[in-house]
């Protein structure tokens, strides 16, 4: 039985019937409880990612490595799987945001993505999202050398949100705008010069924030961008 506290009726019913005590995880960040109740194994997460981590914790313990896809780690096969009666509690992580940056990915990663998935798109990113969650991570700076996460495939940010992955942009991509988004509009926007081109750059930034306002993002704030140039070329 899997569910998030306050989001799934059967979990809330087990709490009301005092079959599970979630006081140690309720309201916490990315925490979960795994407990045997009668003949059931219950996973109750404090929030969305807590629930996901609980499921993947069991998956790893029964023989599925987080790296089964990316590193071809064989999945262990078992004739029987046994669960000891009792309760296991995973507290909130000490580091709130934990993730990776797919940096300087061209040509190797990008070429592989085109060959396997038709591009660095949502079909590829779902495998990255799953890896992050299996590793109990939650944060991603996407590929940006020649890619624009939000524009190349509009399903990519939608799936990130569905999977519970917090998205950001790299150290020289302010306000949720990818490097590639600027380069392909450079004639329209003008020079990366905040002193003399403030109005156009503000508009460019504002559009990025408006586009992503419904998603869980961490926003890079700064004016270094466009091949690491300062905001006055």
Show the residue positions of the predicted features.
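Structural motif
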Residues: 2-7, 44-46, 103-104, 143-146, ...
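An acidic-aromatic substrate-binding cleft motif
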Residues: 70-117, 124, 130-143
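Structural preference for beta-strand elements that scaffold enzyme active sites
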Residues: 97-99, 139, 166-168, 218-220
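Aromatic- and acidic-residue-enriched carbohydrate-binding clefts of CAZyme catalytic domains
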Residues: 106, 115-117, 131, 161-163, ...
């Amino acid at each position: 039985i899997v569910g998030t506290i306050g989001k799934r009726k059967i979990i809330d019913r087990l709490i009301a019937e005092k079959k599970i005590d979630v006081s140690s995880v309720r309201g916490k960040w990315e925490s979960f409880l795994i407990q045997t109740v009668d003949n059931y194994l219950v996973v109750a997460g404090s929030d969305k990612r807590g629930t996901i981590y609980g499921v993947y914790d069991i998956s790893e313990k029964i023989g599925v490595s987080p790296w089964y896809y990316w590193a071809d780690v064989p999945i262990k096969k078992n004739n029987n799987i046994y669960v000891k009666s009792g309760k296991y509690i995973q507290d909130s992580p000490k580091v709130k945001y934990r993730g990776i940056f797919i940096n300087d990915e061209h040509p190797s990663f990008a070429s592989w993505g085109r060959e396997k998935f038709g591009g660095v798109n949502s079909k590829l990113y779902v495998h990255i999202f799953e890896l992050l969650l299996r590793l109990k991570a939650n944060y991603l700076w996407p590929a940006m050398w020649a890619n624009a996460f939000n524009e190349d495939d509009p399903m990519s940010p939608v799936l990130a949100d569905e999977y519970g992955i917090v998205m950001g942009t790299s150290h020289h991509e302010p306000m949720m705008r990818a490097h590639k988004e600027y380069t392909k509009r450079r004639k329209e926007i003008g020079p990366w010069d905040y002193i003399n081109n403030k109005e156009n750059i503000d508009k460019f930034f504002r559009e990025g924030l408006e586009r992503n306002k419904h998603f869980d993002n961490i926003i890079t704030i700064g004016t270094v961008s466009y091949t690491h140039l300062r905001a006055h070329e």
